[in-house]
């Protein structure tokens, strides 16, 4: 198939998935009405989150215009899932530079480190694969979250495949 035909096919499948999620959650005109802005009883916002959860096959979704970038979304997710005394283990090497302050690799007020969350890291092997023996050695009772950065970001390595993440 020509590349543009593949892209069109993917776009159509995604559109069908979103329409099905909207139908499942019975989106109607009332969901587009203005709200008080206080966030209480905002059925439109709540239903939008159900649509996202349905479309992406997740338990729940948090969809807010106040989440301004990927780092902001990751900071929220990390803060929500880690408590003082917990450890975050990165198994694909050092995360994006923008997460360094969130984690506390660079000093920053309100970082996970300042909150009492520790950080450990296992680098990828030279061939870009996960180092499973090193990961097993790094796991401990405090490890509560394993971070995998699929994107290569600014690192000279290939993007980690979904299959490789599934194996991890």
Model-identified regions with their sequence ranges:
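Flexible glycine-/small-residue-enriched beta->alpha junction loops
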Residues: 97-120, 138
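Structural motif
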Residues: 59-63, 86-89, 118-120, 144-145
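Acidic, glycine-rich active-site loops and adjacent beta-strand->loop/helix elements
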Residues: 92-97, 152
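Conserved beta-loop-alpha segment that forms the PLP phosphate-binding cup at the N-terminus of a helix
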Residues: 61-87, 95-106
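Glycine-rich phosphate-binding segment of PLP-dependent enzymes
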Residues: 1-58
């Amino acid at each position: 198939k020509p590349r543009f035909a593949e892209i069109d096919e993917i776009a159509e499948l995604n559109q069908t998935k979103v329409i099905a999620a909207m139908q499942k959650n019975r989106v109607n005109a009332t969901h587009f009405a203005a709200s008080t802005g206080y966030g209480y009883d905002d059925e439109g916002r709540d239903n939008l989150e159900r649509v996202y959860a349905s479309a992406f096959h997740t338990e729940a979704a948090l969809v807010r215009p106040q989440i301004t970038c990927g780092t902001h979304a990751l900071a929220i997710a990390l803060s929500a899932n880690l408590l003082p005394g917990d450890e975050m283990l990165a198994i694909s090497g050092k995360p994006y530079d923008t997460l360094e302050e969130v984690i506390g690799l660079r000093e920053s007020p309100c970082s996970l480190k300042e909150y009492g969350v520790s950080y450990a890291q296992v680098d990828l092997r030279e061939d870009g694969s996960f180092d499973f023996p090193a990961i097993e050695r790094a796991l401990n009772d405090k490890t509560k979250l394993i971070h995998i950065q699929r994107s290569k970001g600014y690192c000279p390595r290939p993007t980690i495949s979904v299959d490789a993440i599934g194996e991890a």
